[in-house]
Regions:
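Acidic, small-polar-rich N-terminal luminal/periplasmic segments of exported/outer-membrane proteins
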Residues: 34-168, 509
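Outer-membrane beta-barrel translocator/receptor signature
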Residues: 132-135, 146-226, 230-236, 288, ...
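Acidic/polar loop-and-plug regions of large Gram-negative outer-membrane beta-barrel proteins
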Residues: 208-212, 225-231, 235-295, 315-351, ...
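Membrane-embedded beta-barrel scaffold of Gram-negative outer-membrane proteins
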Residues: 295-299, 303-309, 313-321, 478, ...
Length: 697
């Protein structure tokens, strides 16, 4: 498919208001517009922080909720883009990256969950989740092992799937067109399936054909997600199924530092440059998923909640990229500084994930104290069968790329890997006088990892959490919290000693202010310490020791406002100071954590205007700022500049029709996110224009 000219989407954007005005004029004599769904900006409750349906103002930990309407308004196309306006989240941590949704939270890596069950393990080979199938995304910042077991210190990103509703049959169908010849057909339909209202179904799906920023590569997807729900007098059961097939390639070409950020005048590569080999570079990923969610209330005191999921994912990832790592400052192999060597890489993981979480919930009182006690057991098993490609790359002139095919010898089977985790947890949410909430929790985990042909490794860990939040009046609720995490580290040192799990500890203090339902302001200060990080042994170059430590501290401010005159505002500001606090190499100690911005800020404003009885106009504008990043290594220290981007929305609703135009990176600013002393640069997003026409019924 030929790519659209960069100018053509902008011309379409300039022409769209005229087309929309014409549509409004034609609709003025038509039927009155249906009552429009309210744009929900200020979420009131979330389940990720406590695994119970708890008000945000009763949750003593920072959590952000991004609703489907909000991330659609902002023009998000993937999970990374959903989080661009969330406090403390570096959403595009590695720029435009089709391999996975890499983000950082408070300078550290989070773990990705879906519907409360873990979805990602390390560098996940699974296709990225389709956000058209989500109703919201919750971000819990900081360690969270008490409820979720082994996980990273950064926190949890929990994507919540669309589920069946028991009302009248409703839905939408739509088409999208946009930059890079994007063409997408999408639909969402659901409602009650019987007269009694005890059975409901929903179907969400889309088909997309598209190119992408990187030349040559496609970004095609098929997504199908049927679901069915049943509700009885005391029980509910929801079955969620999904199938996803992605045909794409690695958008990141690992462009050489010497030809991007540090390039000589006239020698900087365009961020769209493709340095791979057509027909070889590809990502082909299929994911099948089945989830069962069951709730049963025995009586007013005791209830059961159960969640089970099975995922089967198969991916082939192949890429030829520049070998900048052998000589980061000068990767060229010719006198004219044009030709570089390339590395041929291929991986073919076949993954099966089984997860189950079962909990009993007790709702009772002891004197003046109301308890919401949760006691649960969860289990997860991750299996991976892996093949790696045996191939040799070929040189290429990066300024006039004409590729020679790699030399491929075949696929080599790797040892199978299996990881299991069994955890038992208990949590008590104690409420006093309907004003003060105390949260106490503890957990014991047994984690086991096994690599075929090697001894298995077992880790046991106990983690704790505590939090206190109180309503002082006028909607002001200060809080304090402490939480822990652990993450098993597979392998052994040179002397046969198994590595210890990495440990994380966070102390947090903050204030939540909600004087009315349409306004929520959260301020949080935190300090995180992560220990047992692996570093090279200064006494033995062949050994690795766990003496590394990272300390992350910062301040966050986040607000959501929704006014009666169709005006909505969200804003976030964050300052993070993540640094290496302990290392075997004195050069690192006290230095900023690589590739981590210290400053983040964003704001989004949208306003609705009633044009007449049959039509409404909505305009939105957002600004995002990401501070500079540092990279320290053997090649010295480099700074990747900060960048500020703008996004825009123009939407017209005419009776049952909605026509929306989204533009992200409005000024088409070219930037990197980030560049590293290892020798490569990660390109940022270009301007992307997307037009969506949808019909609701």
């Amino acid at each position: 498919m030929p790519a659209l000219s960069p100018r053509r989407p902008l011309l379409y954007a300039l022409a769209l208001p005229t087309l929309l005005a014409s549509a409004v004029a034609q609709a003025q004599d038509g039927p009155a517009a249906r009552t429009l769904d309210k744009v929900t900006v200020v979420a009131e409750r979330a389940s990720t922080a406590t695994k119970t349906d708890t008000a945000l103002t009763e949750t003593p930990q920072a959590i952000s909720v991004v609703t489907q309407q909000l991330f659609t308004d902002r023009g998000a196309h993937n999970l990374q883009e959903v989080l661009r306006y969330s406090a403390g989240v570096t959403a595009d941590a590695w720029g435009l990256d089709t391999r996975n949704d890499a983000t950082s939270v408070r300078g550290l890596d989070p773990v990705q969950y879906q519907d409360g069950l873990r979805r990602s393990y390390g560098f996940s080979p699974l296709a990225r989740p389709e956000i058209y199938g989500l109703e919201r995304v919750e971000v819990l910042r900081g360690p969270s092992s008490v409820l979720y077991g082994a996980g990273a210190t950064g926190g949890i990103i929990n994507a919540m799937s669309k589920r069946p509703t028991f009302g009248a049959l409703t839905g939408e169908v739509g088409v999208q067109f946009g930059s890079f010849d994007r063409r997408q057909l999408q639909g969402d339909i659901g409602g009650a399936l019987n007269d009694a209202g005890t059975l409901a179904g929903r179907f969400v799906g889309l088909v997309r054909e598209s190119n992408m920023q990187t030349d040559v590569l496609n970004d095609d997807r098929i997504y199908l997600a049927p679901s069915i729900g049943w509700r009885g007098e005391r029980s509910t059961l929801t079955l969620l199924a999904s199938y996803q097939h992605d045909r794409t390639g690695s958008s990141q070409q690992f462009l050489p530092l010497a030809a991007t950020l540090l390039a000589l005048p006239g020698r900087r590569l365009d961020t769209s440059t493709f340095i791979g080999h057509p027909g070889f570079d590809r990502i082909d990923s299929r994911v099948y998923s089945l989830t069962a969610l069951f709730d049963h209330s025995f009586n007013d005191v005791l209830s059961l909640r159960s969640a089970v999921r099975y995922i089967d994912g198969r991916t082939t990832l192949q890429q030829m990229y520049v070998d900048s790592y052998s000589n980061p400052a000068d990767p060229f192999i010719d006198a004219d500084h044009r030709v570089v060597n390339r590395t041929a890489y291929g991986t073919r993981p076949d993954v099966q994930i089984f997860s189950a979480d079962n909990a009993l919930q007790f709702d009772f009182a002891t004197g003046a104290f109301q308890h919401l006690l949760l006691a649960g057991v969860d289990y997860s098993q991750y299996k991976e069968q892996l093949q790696r490609l045996d191939a040799t790359g070929t040189p290429i002139d990066i300024y006039a790329p004409v590729s020679a095919a790699p030399v491929v010898r075949g696929w080599d089977r790797q040892p199978d890997q299996t990881s299991t985790q069994l955890g038992v947890y208990v949590q008590d949410q104690i409420r006093w006088a309907d004003r003060v909430s105390l949260v106490l929790g503890a957990r014991r985990d047994h984690a086991r990892s096994k690599t075929e042909g090697q001894p298995s490794q077992t880790d046991n860990a106990t983690t704790y959490r505590a939090g206190l939040i109180g309503d002082l009046g006028a909607g002001v609720s200060p809080y304090l919290s402490y939480s822990e995490s652990f993450l098993p580290v597979t392998g052994q040192d040179l002397f046969g000693q198994a590595f210890k799990p990495m440990r994380g500890r966070q102390s947090e203090a903050g204030i939540k202010w909600q004087p009315a339902r349409n306004l929520l302001l959260t301020m949080a200060a935190y300090r995180i310490t992560e220990t047992n990080r692996q570093t090279n042994d200064p006494d033995n170059v062949l050994n690795v020791v766990q003496t590394g430590q990272i300390r992350s501290k910062g301040l966050e401010l986040e607000g959501q406002f929704q006014f009666a005159n169709n005006l909505t505002i969200t804003a976030a500001v964050a300052r993070n100071e993540a640094e290496v606090s302990r290392s075997n190499f004195a050069l690192e100690v006290g230095q900023r954590l690589n590739d981590t911005p210290q400053d983040l800020a964003s704001a989004w404003v949208s306003k609705g205007f009633q044009l007449d009885d049959a039509a409404r106009l909505r305009l939105g504008l957002g600004v995002r700022h990401v501070g500079n990043t540092a990279s320290l290594g053997n090649g010295g220290r480099i700074i990747t500049p900060s960048y500020t981007l703008a996004d825009a929305l123009v939407e017209v609703q005419v009776t049952d029709w909605t026509m929306a135009l989204n533009i992200t990176n409005l000024t088409d600013k070219r930037y990197y996110a980030p560049c590293r002393t290892f020798g490569d640069c990660f390109a940022g997003y270009p301007r992307v224009v997307t037009g969506t026409i949808s019909y609701r019924f």
